[in-house]
Amino acid sequence: MTRDGQKFDLDEELLEKLYAKYAKGGLRVSGWRQWAYFVTKKSLWVSVVASTRALKRVMDIAGSAVGLVLLSPVFIITALLIKIEDGGPIFYGQDRVGKWGKIFRMYKFRSMVVNADKMKDTLLDQNESGGVMFKMKRDPRITRVGRVIRKLSIDELPQLLNVLKGDMSLVGPRPPVPREVAEYELSDRRRLDMVPGLTCLWQVSGRSDIDFEGQVRLDVQYLESQSLKGDIILLLKTIPAVLSGRGAY
């Protein structure tokens, strides 16, 4: 065969591997027919993935918009309670790492004292989470209102704005902070191949009771098997998981 006036040969070994992986029914073809079959199969797969992502984004926009409207009374009551308790800011913004390492600003209802970030450095030796995350079951930085809204995951509701904006999805791995990502092993970085979400597999399977390695394993499992049906099932499982309060601290 020729291309641009130069002779080249097909990599027959590569074609055989591609054929073995993608061909069905025992049909034996060779050369360009194998290559054409593979390209067609790959193109169809890309089209399905693109369509699924588009539908997922539509679901994110609709779900976050409806959620913001229906939960507006909860927003108002929570904001008032936070303000009354210590007079500090209602919301807490923090840089998080999204898909492919993109940094974005994620929002929560403030559940800790105003100087919580500075206090964290003095508590690092009491970290109860394995891996690169920081978790304490009895974190002294959490306020009285904060304990309630964290138990019911109300503190996460402002992230519906992040979903509406497109920084996050309703379902996907929880977005890590840059300091955690800096300590990731290469295998851990697969979590960054997806848009982060409000809920995920480990959020409905024990939340903070699951160690870092377990969270990564479940996130990768979601990456390799994600579907709209699976997302809907995860959203439905999130409701009883939140109400139970298991692993929330």
PLM features: residue spans?
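A hydrophobic, helix-centered structural microdomain
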Residues: 45-119, 228, 233-249
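Acyl-group handling in specialized metabolite and lipid biosynthesis
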Residues: 46, 219-223
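A short, structured surface patch at a secondary-structure boundary
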Residues: 132-195, 234-242
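Short glycine/proline-rich turn/loop motifs
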Residues: 39-49, 124-129, 139-142
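Residue-level recognition of specific faces of alpha-helices
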Residues: 80, 93, 108, 141-144, ...
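N-terminal hydrophobic signal-anchor/signal peptide
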Residues: 1-69, 249
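Short, glycine-rich, amphipathic interfacial segments at transmembrane boundaries or analogous
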Residues: 92-140, 199-217
